[in-house]
């Protein structure tokens, strides 16, 4: 199945706050620049690319010199407003160095749930892609209250990236995180932790292996990534979870190399291949 990834034409790349930011709250410019180069080169190769990027609140905290993520809704939305503007400025700068035009698309759950507005989003994304533009999608944190409280089914950008992948009928969703893939135990505490190379069904046993929430500036944990993977598999789409510290790993994935965990449903008897 990995070999078939070479033929993927339309890609959705999701990058999380933990990949865009250092643990000390500063922006990881090196990673962002590499990401811009990789995605621009995929465009040069003839691929269609959509970037789903978190980071508005994390970048906003950095811009406003906040060491702790705010907890009140008005403060979170204010920080997101500043951060989203700064984030797009950074992306535009780095993508511009490679001659790649980007466009901002901010979504909320009601927009993707309502048929007419959902179709408008699909048409807009298709129009951007047809013009060779890389859409940069984020949830509109400035108005999306429920996501900021972590109580909605929309969840965070992990699930949003899966929804976007379905909307544009992407061939592959690549989720860049701060972990190499899905493990049977926490690799940070268990040196013998085993990574799944492929998962064909999200079972209760798989869910039980997932831990809690993610970084202090982000919202996602392994459970949200499993929810996104489940959404993709229900839509007969593929998702790969891998480490985003070096975005050039995307090139290796597109060559069919065994990197990260591939989530893909199979009709035959389920099996979980592992890498040791």
From Swiss-Prot:
Keywords: Amino-acid biosynthesis, ATP-binding, Cytoplasm, Kinase, Nucleotide-binding, Proline biosynthesis, Transferase. The keyword NADP does not apply. Pathway: Amino-acid biosynthesis; L-proline biosynthesis; L-glutamate 5-semialdehyde from L-glutamate: step 1/2. It is found in: Cytoplasm. The keyword Nucleotide-binding applies. ATP binds at residues 14, 177-178, 219-225. Substrate binds at residues 54, 141, 157. InterPro entries: AceGlu_kinase-like_sf, Asp/Glu/Uridylate_kinase, G5K_ProB, Glu/AcGlu_kinase, Glu_5kinase, Glu_5kinase/COase_Synthase, Glutamate_5-kinase_CS. GO terms for biological process: L-proline biosynthetic process. SUPFAM superfamilies: Carbamate kinase-like. It holds the Pfam family AA_kinase. Its EC number is 2.7.2.11. Its main location: cytoplasm. It is an enzyme of class 2 (transferase). One of its GO terms (molecular function) is glutamate 5-kinase activity. It catalyses: L-glutamate + ATP = L-glutamyl 5-phosphate + ADP. GO terms for cellular component: cytosol. Catalyzes the transfer of a phosphate group to glutamate to form L-glutamate 5-phosphate. Belongs to the glutamate 5-kinase family. NCBIfam families: proB. This is Glutamate 5-kinase. It comes from Listeria monocytogenes serotype 4b (strain CLIP80459).
